[in-house]
Amino acid sequence: LGHDIEASWLLCEAAEALGESDSIRGLALKIASAASEGLAGDGSLFYEKDDAAGHFDRDRHWWVQAEAVVGFLNAWQLSGDSGWLELASDALDYILQNISDPVNGEWHWSIRADGTINLDDDKAGFWKCPYHNG
């Protein structure tokens, strides 16, 4: 689901660079809508879901939450629908309340499906870079 919401805004950036912004708007909103089906009641976006394989990872990874903010803001900019703005705000609230570590800094890698903080994976490392949460 993280890659889906990420794709919704990256496609817009690519289309804009090619001068094709209008042609991608509807598709970007459809992708954002599909990704939003993976939202939890607390405003977070689950990591990934593959219906064909019967796989549903309900962890909340740091980068997926960051991409949710950007993707839902982009959907709001494209559509003017304030519902997207609310989803972006909810995702940001989730980051601030659960992913961000105000005591020791940085963002936790993830919140597990059971609601506990994942302390096993790096808080800072190769995959954590300005691309997603800078």
Q: Model-derived features: where do they sit?
A:
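Glycan-recognition and catalytic cores of secretory/periplasmic carbohydrate-active enzymes
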Residues: 1-134
